[in-house]
Amino acid sequence: MGSRFFLALFLILLVLGCEVQATQQLQQDDPGSPALLDKVQESISSYWDTAKAAAQDLYQKTYLTSVDEKLRDMYSKSSAAMTTYASIFTDQILTLLKGE
């Protein structure tokens, strides 16, 4: 019975030692991760800001009032058409659900 006790005690200590070692390794890995994540976020943010600034600059250089007016007109007509079709679709769905 003494050897079983020592074997069980040895296994418990081995498991506890492995958990303590794993906890220490996780604590050592954690400080590096946020720094890497911050670097990646800053890099993506700077690329996005650069692309946005380039797109705005290109838009300002190629701004044409006639094209802008056509786009605004096209947007207003298409949004009016979508509103009409959405209301027709809604009426059809309500008619199907009511069963009239």
UniProtKB/Swiss-Prot annotation:
Signal peptide: 1-22
Keyword Cytoplasm set for record: no
Pfam families, per the entry: Apo-CII (PF05355)
Naturally occurring in which organism (per UniProt): Microtus agrestis
Biological process according to GO: lipid catabolic process; lipid transport; positive regulation of phospholipid catabolic process
Location of region: Lipid binding: 66-74
Keywords assigned: Chylomicron, HDL, LDL, Lipid degradation, Lipid metabolism, Lipid transport, Secreted, Signal, Transport, VLDL
InterPro entries documented for this protein: Apo-CII, ApoC-II_dom_sf
GO cellular component: chylomicron; high-density lipoprotein particle; low-density lipoprotein particle; very-low-density lipoprotein particle
Protein's name in the database: Apolipoprotein C-II
Gene3D superfamilies: Apolipoprotein C-II
Residue ranges of the region described as Lipoprotein lipase cofactor: 78-100
Compartments in which it is found: Secreted
Taxonomic lineage of the native organism: Eukaryota, Metazoa, Chordata, Craniata, Vertebrata
Biological role: Component of chylomicrons, very low-density lipoproteins (VLDL), low-density lipoproteins (LDL), and high-density lipoproteins (HDL) in plasma. Plays an important role in lipoprotein metabolism as an activator of lipoprotein lipase.
GO molecular function, one term: phospholipase activator activity
Protein family according to the UniProt entry: Belongs to the apolipoprotein C2 family.
Processing after translation: Proapolipoprotein C-II is synthesized as a sialic acid containing glycoprotein which is subsequently desialylated prior to its proteolytic processing.
